[in-house]
């Protein structure tokens, strides 16, 4: 299954709030049905599927990519669900978004793909590149790169930055201070349901 490229607001309404997918503010719809107040019974498979889709759409992953991350998380020490979130949060594209350098994760991915980002003085064009404590993320010394990202920073750095990251406004560079903790994940998700969804595939 390929990465979703359709209307983002439509997707957000379906699985729930996904702050990394769009910077738009949703308007409530009068015909929206809240499952918590509906009498219709929802299967456990449906619940797990929707949590999985929420996670996949938020981080902009293909089905194959998410399954790969789940398999890696299962082999690691600790809670599989929390390790999975940690792997996704420490991706380069998500880190750029959380630093306020891009309005959305898709926007951050585009910055990386177009070569606007350097990491530890090396140009990185792989959005899935995994971050580690001590990594320094900078903007390439090009007028186009610095102008574009400076504009994003002015607009989106008002949002609360997670404690595992920091940003130097003077030098226009971000730092990864430590591995992300569960409470710093900016997504309402039950990661255990995602792990359960993939239980027969890993």
UniProtKB/Swiss-Prot annotation:
PROSITE patterns: RIBOSOMAL_S4, S4. One of its GO terms (biological process) is ribosomal small subunit biogenesis. Residues 90-153 form the S4 RNA-binding domain. GO terms for cellular component: chloroplast; small ribosomal subunit. Coiled coil: none annotated. One of its GO terms (molecular function) is rRNA binding. Keywords: Chloroplast, Plastid, Ribonucleoprotein, Ribosomal protein, RNA-binding, rRNA-binding. It holds the Pfam family Ribosomal_S4. Residues 20-37 have a biased composition (Polar residues). It comes from the Eukaryota. Residues 13-37 are annotated as: Disordered. Belongs to the universal ribosomal protein uS4 family. One of the primary rRNA binding proteins, it binds directly to 16S rRNA where it nucleates assembly of the body of the 30S subunit. This is Small ribosomal subunit protein uS4c. It comes from Takakia lepidozioides. The lineage of its organism: Eukaryota, Viridiplantae, Streptophyta, Embryophyta, Bryophyta. The gene is rps4.
């Amino acid at each position: 299954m390929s990465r979703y490229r359709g209307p983002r607001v439509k997707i957000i309404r379906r699985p729930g709030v996904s702050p990394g997918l769009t910077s738009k503010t949703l308007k409530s719809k009068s015909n929206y049905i809240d499952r918590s107040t509906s009498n219709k019974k929802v299967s456990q498979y449906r619940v797990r599927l929707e949590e999985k889709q929420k996670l996949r759409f938020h981080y902009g992953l293909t089905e194959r990519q998410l399954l790969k991350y789940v398999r890696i998380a299962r082999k690691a020490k600790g809670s599989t669900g929390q390790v999975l979130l940690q792997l996704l949060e420490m991706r380069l594209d998500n880190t750029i978004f959380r630093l306020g350098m891009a309005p959305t994760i898709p926007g951050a991915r585009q910055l990386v793909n177009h070569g606007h980002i350097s990491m530890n003085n090396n140009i990185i064009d792989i959005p899935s590149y995994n971050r580690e404590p001590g990594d320094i993320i900078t903007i390439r010394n090009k007028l186009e790169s610095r102008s574009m990202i400076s504009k994003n920073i002015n607009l989106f750095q008002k949002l609360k930055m997670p404690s595992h990251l920091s940003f130097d406004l003077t030098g226009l560079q971000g730092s990864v201070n430590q591995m992300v903790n569960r409470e710093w994940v900016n997504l309402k998700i039950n990661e255990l349901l995602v792990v359960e969804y993939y239980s027969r595939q890993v």
